[in-house]
Amino acid sequence: MPKTNEPSRPTPPTSSREDGGGGSSVHPANVLNELSGEEWLYFTKSVWSTAYPSELGHERRRAHGANKPPRLMARLIEFFTRTGELVLDPFAGVGGTLLGAAIARGPRRAIGFEIEPRWVRIFETVVAEALASRDGEGPLLADLGPADPGGPRRFDPSGIELRLGDALELLPTLAEASIDFVATDPPYNVQLRQTMAGGPLAARFPNRRTDYAMVTNDPADLANSADYGAYLDRMGCVFGELARVLRPGRYAVVIVRDAYQDGRYVFTAADLAARAAAAGLVPKGDLIWYQAGTRLRPYGYPRVFVPNIAHQHILVFRKEARRSRRGERGGRPAR
């Protein structure tokens, strides 16, 4: 079980990446991660276009309509942490973040919270199957290019744990400044019972129907908030807890999708960014994640414009370290 009552101990920087780094050395001043300069630069592109294959139990995980690819989460984890550091996902779903920690080049520890028992069971099944894959040698991942070369990958779930419960109840159990990185995919908005064509329109426009359904009956589920304002208020409480448990100088990533509800576009990412900033998490970037192959639906056709939202926002925040009287931290200018 990952420990949260003491700071983790990062592994000293290595001289080069053993897999996927092209032999490029790690800069001796790099204390954030174990990436080469080339890998670091590639990560900072503000638009990511991905088409992930079905791997790591995707056929099971896809039951969750917003499951996140472990390869994507591993990429984030490898940039914002070092081997052995502790990652938190307070809205873990079927465990994409935890699986990403287990396949990271240099495994990380990870804690996840999930309110829905069904998703926890799926995660546990996926872990068991991944451990048994290729006679215990770990998964064989597809080559996705220089940013994610794939190949044989060690699967080490010994440091990951998914806890069943409400994030707002479990977050206070974590020690202050005990987490090295937060990576999460919260409910995007208040769930609507009907987001596509229904009733008499369902028969006429079957291509507008969807099997996307993740609504729980638990009132603690943020997606069951009374309205959008209540949802934002509860997310503000979450951000306050994340700012408390995150170590100074470390990062939090929140993946969120804007919405179109009641005839208007909802800038959910901007609203959540404002709540995070109010809680003390400083905005550092917005990486646009475009999921190639997203199915397009004729929502407003043939009368009005309604967007097909095929991208998500990977919002990057930082809990700034305290500055000295000279406006510096750790002997270096704050950035």
Stretches found by the model and what they are:
Residues 2-335:
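Class I S-adenosyl-L-methionine-dependent methyltransferase catalytic core
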